[in-house]
């Protein structure tokens, strides 16, 4: 870090990028580079250089994440900086999400969507094209919902595959969803809607590799599973937005009006939601079906 400081002042840099902060060290401390002491003291040195009244600079410090998805090292590092941006994504998928988890000068939770290509990170300007598969008609095992990421509303397509298991313990696989959440939804389907999955393998994923972070997608997940099990397609202009409780009842989700307006703008024709007080006349091109529970939805979608 001592040599870096000399170089920064020599070049009179306006923006400094340290990749990564854990690889820098100060000679005045005996601790190894990457240790909590070295990391914090190097970060403190960066703060001093950034706030120097004679020459103010912007510093970008790249840091590592641990396996639980938190910043590696002391939380003090997070408190030192003005903004924390987390770049998240799986190595086998192109999708990368850039999320602001701390921002002293603006809102947090905002999300940027990018695709990792040969030439680097490319902005996803049209999420609908990226996350939704273009089809002329519906297909078995597919259902669409809308999920909130920061202030953005994203269409999300859930694909499911249900197949007979010949093993004592059926497989439940969901890369986009926590296994406990998937098992809970399967149990609700079985007990509250009569979809017997006790001897069936169930695999689900969200197209594009998007992680499911909202309960509002519960209904779409369950409908996609039921569609695959019953071998009946769902109309590709129909969407499902509701949290599903353990009783099988549909619960309303936050900002339902803005979600419905966005879906109407995108050309969807029908939306299944939980009971809530909305004026259906506001949506001229979107049929809104308020349902009480998951059993009602399955009956209306597949058996009418």
Q: Model-derived features: where do they sit?
A:
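Peripheral, non-AAA+ core regions of ATP-driven protein-machinery
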Residues: 1-15, 21-304
